[in-house]
Structures are given as structure tokens and as C-alpha cells.
Curated annotation (Swiss-Prot):
Gene Ontology molecular function: any one: ATP binding
Domain UvrD-like helicase C-terminal: 294-542
GO BP, sorted A to Z: DNA replication; recombinational repair
Species per Swiss-Prot/TrEMBL record: Mycoplasma genitalium (strain ATCC 33530 / DSM 19775 / NCTC 10195 / G37)
Organism placement in taxonomy: Bacteria, Bacillati, Mycoplasmatota, Mycoplasmoidales, Mycoplasmoidaceae
Keyword Transmembrane helix applies: no
Designated gene of the protein: uvrD
Function of the protein: Has both ATPase and helicase activities. Unwinds DNA duplexes with 3' to 5' polarity with respect to the bound strand and initiates unwinding most effectively when a single-stranded region is present. Involved in the post-incision events of nucleotide excision repair and methyl-directed mismatch repair.
GO cellular component: cytosol; DNA helicase complex
Alphabetized Gene3D superfamilies for the sequence: 1.10.10.160, P-loop containing nucleotide triphosphate hydrolases (3.40.50.300)
Annotated protein name in UniProt: Probable DNA helicase II homolog
Length: 703
């Protein structure tokens, strides 16, 4: 550890704030602080609470702490996410268990399906709810106001439908809340709200829990939202020993409730002296050339936020190479993708970097879909299965919830996941005298002779319930894995989780397992195979890769501007911070790409690129089509003049011509543009590629 870290770790009691820049070892600092308190200050580990944001981060923290303290103390450590801590608190306090069901999007689809709203409009609102509403940590009294705000956000220029939509959404929310109460369910933001309500309304309970924890450590504090901050303040009521690690320049979750200026608010609330503030700026992740670019963006953020510009705010590293980050501007999305593919393959073959240690980062989710299609067409880069894994887990969770609650909505959702729900079944249910879907399924199984073709599948759900009631858990999950076609990788992980969960238990609790599964989604589906990482920048926060490609640095895309925020300075700052986070995910190689046109429409490069002194800090890829896997990029002694690889005259090529590439073999021309041709290569490893007509590697061939 360096001196900056040592000073922070060995600080005294009270509220201490550690400003730890990207890659400066936040986890190292917080885990060593935990160990310092136990080993040096002789604090009982059961009286230390460490909180972070993801299950994966919590597991990593626990793993590191147990290497620093006596292993016999493992059972006494309290390392949680905010949600898992609140879940434990509610179980211990209320002496009852809840089912965590955060699938608000399904509920809203069901509710809005019967409305007269335009289907595209309804989908737009559902997507907004899915992306933002489920993360709002709000007082119940503010919900109507937030819903109205969300309507305004989604319905610009749709005044005639606004009133209807507002009413529909508020009614949907009320129904959603009632459904949870009736079925003993909580969503993730309920966990926090219930915990805070109980603590704020019961002084004895507050004293008990704030007395229990002598020290509280919080990682990534800049990402906390208002209710999380209120929870922390209540938990330090007695002892007031709080150790916070964060970086305000990486605050990228304002859109889901993180409070801008939360660190400033805390300093005011707790009257934190300057002596209790620590600045860590030695980066252990990135090459100094990458940090030079990051610091250019950091200076702009500081200028916008009127921060004092000092050296302690800028990052430095002792990791130095002569490889500058590369900026590449392609003529089209396809050219951009091909260039990225070839660089990835070159890194894999020449630098021996595994695919899993490389990432393509996107500002928008929909760009990932486009890239997946292009990678599949290329056929040479292995794709991750995280999205498929996530969908499989969601379906499994839906079925388990239905087995537990047996409500109409949950059973219908489960039958859809099992591909049993059909129009015939729906019609027969309407015709029957059964209002409860579970009763109807039992009735239908007994009456299959009358409607055998339509009801033959309904007995399957009843079988699942019988297996659960008889505690035949292994048979239950074997059936589910087979029916839902769960991937072997996920199946193996779930069997392991089931084994661990059932250890020392005399009876299997389905609701308890559902909650455990919901709290660990992120750690179950993490990428463990050697496949390329395709992530939004938000999803990449906290991760690091040997090589990073920042995709689509174009104005309007990154920064992403919608009509309602194009003149919003705070939004611009948020986008700059997002760019800073993207840059600092890279350890050795950084590539930034943009395009000149999309769908034949010209598009400008991102204005953020103007904040970087390109001639000093970037290598500019001046040719848009470097098709070969070029070793020269990795050899600092070679400076390639790509213009030497072009003819003065372009080939005269038409659709249907047979051509030969020196690098990819024979292929057929399937599309021709002014300067380039799209070639479908016979070797399926290469798929289709755009090639400049005047590239020397391309020649016409004879049939």
C-alpha cells in the first residue's frame, strides 16, 4: 500500500471520507480498514458493518477480508449490499419472511393491456418504468408526483393522451402496491423503505441497531441515493464512526436516484473536518497514457462543477508504455464493427489477451443488439450468454413465485414461462365457474377427458406444486431445468447454490430461496467463459479489462441527448462522468470509435472528443479500413503508412463479381458503394466484410 492509502486506513474515530479515484484501490482501502479495526484496534468484527452495492462486490470484499484477519472470525463478519442488509433486518425484526418480486414491468404490461392506450405509447411507458421507476427510493407521499413527472418525461408532444396516461399509471401503481401487500411481496425499494420506516418510528429498535455497529464502512458512497443515506445516518446514531470511500467524479447513477452532492451533504450534516478527508490518486489499473486522456476529461468535469483544480484530483500511474489510446472514425456502423473485430482478434493472437479480458462499451443498450448481430455474422469472436442466462433465471423465478403464492397473476406469468398458457386455456378459464386460476388448473386436470387436447399441459403445473409440497426439491428443480431448457452452466451453478442453501436445514423454504435467488442474480450470471464482454458503460462500473473499446462516440449518442435534456448542464456533466468511467475501465489498451454516417445520414463526432488534445494524447487511425490483423500496431518500432496499402485507382466491381482477398480468401460481392464493396467470403469464419475498392489486398478472381 502507498502512503496515501496507509493514512486513510489508520485514521481515527468519527466520520472519515476517502476520495478514491478510478483504479486507486477502493476495495483494498475498505478491506484493509476492516482488518485494521479488527487486528490493531481490537474491534469485534460482529460490530463492524461493511456495505457495498452488488453481491459480487460484497463477496470480493469478504474474500479479501478473510485473508487479512483470523479465519475463525469469518462467521462474525457483516458484509452486505444495501438490499441484503435490509432483508436481514426485516427478517430479524418482523420475524417473518417476504418474497422479493421486482418484476414491475410484467405487472404493468398486464395492467396496460386492457387500456385504450396506443400499444407503442404503452411500451414506451413500461420501458421507462422498467429503467427508472423500480429504482426510485421515494417517500410514499411523493409517488403521485414522481409518476406524473415520469409521464411528462415520456409523453412530450402527446398532450391529448397525457391525462389518460397519467390516470392509468397512477392506477397501475396503486394496483401494484395492493398486489404486493396481499401476496406478502416486497420489491427492492420496499426493502429500504420498510427498514427506514421501522427505524425512524421505533426509538428502541433504532438504539438497538445503532448500538450494535461500532463502525460502519460504505463503499462507492457517491452512488447512494437519499433513502440509503438516511439509513446510514440512522445506523450511526449512537457511535458515529463512519468510514466512506467514494469518487464524486464517478457518480453516474443520478438517473436512478443517486443524489448529486451527497458527499458535500454528508460533510455538512456531520461537520467533517478537513483532517478527516483523504485523497487517493495513485492509479494501479491504467497505463499512464490512458490516464492522460482521463485527466483531460476530469479537468472538464472539475471546471463544470467549479471544483478546485489541484494535483490531488488528477490520476497518475507508474505503469508506462509508449502505446497511446487510439481514435478511429469509420464511414459506417459496419466499418466500425469490422475495425473493432480485427483489433480484438489481433489483441487475442498477438498480445495473447483472452476475449474475456476485453470489452466493448456502449452508451445505449440497443447498440449492443446491433453489435451482437454483426459479431454473429462475423462468426470469429465468441459471444457471452449473459442475456440468455438472465432470461432463464427470470423464468425460473417466475415459476417458483407462482408455486409459492398461487395467485392468478403469478400463475399466469409462470404458465407463460413454461409455454403452457394458450388462448384455448384462457378461453376455457373464462367459460368455467372458477375465479381462481389455481382452482381452475386443479379442475381442468380432473376434466381432461372433455377437453383433453386443450388441457393436457395443465397437469404439469399441478405436478410442480405437488413436488414442492412433498419437499421433493431435487425432483422439482430437475423438472424445471428440463422444461425451461436451462443452460448447463446455469444449471450447475444453481445446483451448487441449492446444496449450499439446504445445508443444515431440516425443511426447504421456497420463499426464502426465491429471496436468496433475487439478491444474487448479478453474481450468478457473471461472465466466466472466454467470451467478449458487451456492456453499457453503466454496467461496466467497477470492472476492469486489459483492452477497452468505447463504441459510437458521436454527438447525440455519447453524450446521449434527448429532446428534454439537450440544454441541461447537469446532464452534460453526468455524461462526461460516464465517459470518464468508460476510459478508466482500460488497463493497457484503449480504443475510441465513431462513425461518419448512419443510414446514409451524416453524423458528427462527440463534442467530448474536443476536450482531448488529440495530437498529444491520441493515435489517430487515419484509414477507415485496416482489414488485416496488423502486428505493426503492437510494435513500437514500426510506424505503418496505411496509404501505401491503397491503389491509385479502384477496381471496377459489380454485384456478383468473384474477388479474392489476401487475408480472407475468395468471396462474392453482394453490395457496392462509392468507395467500398461488401464481400461474402466462402470461409464462414470471416462472414461478410466491407473492403475499400482500392485496397491492394483485393483482386478480381475468375469463376
Amino acid at each position: 500500500m502507498n502512503e496515501q492509502q496507509k493514512q486513510a486506513i489508520s485514521c481515527g474515530k468519527g466520520v472519515n471520507v476517502v476520495y478514491s479515484g478510478a483504479g486507486t484501490g477502493k476495495t483494498t482501502i475498505i478491506t484493509n480498514r476492516f482488518a485494521y479495526l479488527v487486528n490493531k484496534e481490537k474491534v469485534d468484527p460482529s460490530r463492524i458493518l461493511a456495505i457495498t452495492f452488488t453481491k459480487k462486490a460484497a463477496k470480493e470484499m469478504q474474500f479479501r477480508i478473510l485473508k487479512l484477519i483470523d479465519s475463525s472470525l469469518a462467521e462474525k463478519t457483516n458484509i452486505y449490499t444495501f438490499h441484503s442488509f435490509c432483508n436481514k433486518f426485516l427478517i430479524q425484526t418482523l420475524k417473518k419472511r417476504f418474497i422479493i418480486d421486482d418484476d414491475i414491468s410484467y405487472f404493468l404490461k398486464e395492467f396496460l393491456a386492457d387500456s385504450k392506450l396506443d400499444i407503442n405509447l404503452a411500451k414506451q411507458i413500461i420501458d421507462n418504468f422498467k429503467n427508472t421507476f423500480a429504482d426510485f427510493e421515494i417517500n410514499k407521499l411523493d409517488q403521485d408526483e414522481r409518476l406524473i413527472s415520469l409521464c411528462e418525461h415520456s409523453l412530450l408532444n402527446k398532450d391529448e393522451e397525457y391525462s389518460t396516461l397519467k390516470t392509468q399509471l397512477i392506477n397501475a401503481f396503486i394496483s401494484y402496491e395492493k398486489n404486493k401487500i396481499l401476496n406478502n411481496k416486497l420489491d427492492f425499494h420496499d426493502l429500504l423503505i420498510k427498514t427506514c420506516n421501522l427505524l425512524s418510528n421505533d426509538n428502541d429498535l433504532l438504539n438497538q441497531w445503532s448500538e450494535q455497529f461500532q463502525h460502519i464502512l460504505v463503499d462507492e458512497f457517491q452512488d447512494t441515493n437519499q433513502i440509503q443515506y438516511e439509513l446510514i445516518k440512522m445506523l450511526v446514531t449512537k457511535n458515529k464512526n463512519l468510514f466512506l470511500v467514494g469518487d464524486n467524479n464517478q457518480m453516474i447513477y443520478r438517473w436512478r436516484g443517486a443524489v448529486n452532492g451527497i458527499i458535500t451533504a454528508l460533510k455538512h450534516d456531520f461537520n467533517v473536518p478537513k483532517s478527516n478527508e483523504f485523497f487517493i490518486n495513485q492509479n494501479y489499473r491504467c497505463d499512464q497514457n490512458i490516464l492522460a486522456v482521463a485527466n483531460q476529461i476530469l479537468l472538464k468535469i472539475m471546471a463544470y462543477e467549479k471544483q478546485v483544480k489541484t494535483e490531488k484530483n488528477l490520476l497518475f500511474s507508474t505503469l508506462n508504455s509508449d502505446k497511446k489510446p487510439v481514435y478511429f472514425q469509420a464511414e459506417s456502423v459496419e466499418n466500425q464493427a469490422n475495425w473493432i473485430f480485427n483489433k480484438i482478434k489481433a489483441l487475442n493472437q498477438t498480445e495473447k489477451i483472452n476475449f474475456k479480458d476485453m470489452a466493448i462499451l456502449f452508451r445505449k443498450n440497443r447498440d449492443i443488439t446491433t453489435m451482437v448481430e454483426l459479431i454473429e455474422a462475423d462468426g470469429t469472436i465468441p459471444l457471452p450468454k449473459q442475456k440468455s442466462y438472465f432470461n432463464q433465471l427470470v423464468k425460473l423465478q417466475r415459476v417458483l413465485i407462482a408455486i409459492s403464492t398461487r395467485t392468478n397473476l403469478d400463475i399466469k406469468r409462470a404458465l407463460q414461462a413454461l409455454k403452457i398458457w394458450s388462448n384455448d386455456l384462457k378461453e376455457l378459464w373464462k367459460q368455467s365457474d372458477k375465479t381462481n386460476l389455481f382452482d381452475f388448473l386443479k379442475w381442468s386436470e380432473l376434466n381432461q377427458k372433455n377437453h383433453s387436447s386443450k388441457l393436457k399441459a395443465t397437469g404439469y403445473f399441478n405436478l410442480l406444486i405437488k413436488l414442492a409440497e412433498d419437499q421433493q426439491i431435487n425432483l422439482l428443480f430437475t423438472e424445471l431445468f428440463k422444461k425451461l431448457k436451462v443452460d448447463q452452466t446455469i444449471e450447475n451453478l444453481l445446483w451448487k447454490k441449492l446444496t449450499e442453501f439446504q445445508k443444515d436445514k431440516t425443511e426447504f423454504s421456497l420463499s426464502e430461496f426465491i429471496t436468496s435467488l433475487a439478491l444474487e442474480f448479478d453474481s450468478i450470471i457473471e461472465n466466466s467463459s472466454d467470451t467478449i464482454n458487451l456492456l453499457t458503460v453503466h454496467a461496466a462500473k467497477g470492472l476492469e479489462f486489459e483492452a477497452v473499446f468505447i463504441y459510437g462516440m458521436n454527438q447525440g449518442d455519447f453524450p446521449l441527448f434527448l429532446s428534454q435534456n439537450q440544454n441541461d448542464e447537469q446532464h452534460l456533466i453526468d455524461e462526461l462522468k460516464l465517459f470518464y468511467v468508460a476510459i478508466t475501465r482500460a488497463k493497457r489498451f484503449l480504443f475510441i470509435t465513431a462513425v461518419l454516417q448512419i443510414n446514409n445520414n451524416s453524423i458528427k463526432p462527440s463534442s467530448f472528443l474536443n476536450y482531448i488534445n488529440k495530437s498529444e494524447y491520441l493515435d489517430i487511425a487515419t484509414i477507415n479500413y485496416v482489414l488485416e490483423q496488423d502486428d505493426d500496431f503492437f510494435d513500437s518500432t514500426k510506424k505503418t503508412d496505411y496509404t501505401k496499402k491503397l491503389r491509385k485507382e479502384s477496381l471496377d466491381i459489380i454485384v456478383g463479381d468473384l474477388v479474392t482477398s489476401r487475408y480472407f480468401g475468395k468471396g462474392v460481392v453482394v453490395e457496392v458503394r462509392d468507395k467500398e464493396v461488401l464481400v461474402a467470403f466462402k470461409d464462414t469464419r470471416y462472414g461478410m466484410k466491407w473492403i475499400l475498392k482500392n485496397h491492394k489486398s483485393l483482386t478480381k478472381a475468375l469463376y
